[in-house]
């Protein structure tokens, strides 16, 4: 590294030394300096995400080793992306804002000893643009400058042409304490969440970008980011698209305060196991069964509002269930087809009495937990995320029943 970059490099070394004791942050070994160069030794990695997906460009040749890495990522994309959220959470816990999350800076390292065979280990690298938050401060003022890479920066890091001409991008000509402009307001950890959302989309769509247009024009990404023109069509990938769509849409919110924290990303239903998803739906049923019904409580009314998203235009969930399954519900409780409460009760009751069902009905609904969960989510794709949103809307995420879903580690 040339002498004029020594200051930047020494900052990177310092941050690497502070943060590298984590499996999803690149490992620093040593550094040496002579009169001409600074040498930094970090762990050897196999490729970057950009090397593998190449922005989705057709006709790019991949080596066998690269194709194996792509296959390993795609087999369990949730595990791969969770690692990135985990690594970023580690940096944020150390008060480090990366400011340049992008595919070129996400590397595929060699697996650690305790990893399952065939899985990959992703690490966050390149700390040249990182900034450390002082104690008791959540925002850096006047440091937006040239942080980030075009097309991967959060909207608050993108200056308008007039602002660039006036010098406001460096915090010179404007009072940041009184300005309403996001650039002048400073940098929060949320800038990394936005960029990570773009990377999540990139991996799940094999190299597409959420702010390209339908024809894939990379040149207009920055404009689309500033104008809030996300294009998430590529994420509509069938029955399993609702959870990643919800998460990425949340991460790409225009206003920093509307984005999730790294911990919230890690605890999102996208990363939950099938067993955890099914248990959550059953806990939702248990909770709302105890709400007053005549007249309905505000919480129960809010749950039923989501029936318009979960049920189709016929407004009858019973019409989507198999005849044998409906018969197995029994006559003890009456089920009304247009009610979310009854849908959740049916799901919970048959899960709890799964072994009482005939073998023919079991074959229809599949085994617990994965087959049974999919029986419901393929018929009602928005069920899980609607219940998740309802818990948040009602402020129930801190309740003992729901707290483990929103604060516990997931993978």
How should these model regions be labeled?
Residues 27-38, 46:
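Short beta-strand micro-motifs within the conserved protein kinase catalytic domain, predominantly
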Residues 158-234:
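Conserved C-lobe activation region of Hanks-type protein kinase-like domains
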Residues 277-411:
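Regulatory extensions appended to serine/threonine kinase catalytic cores
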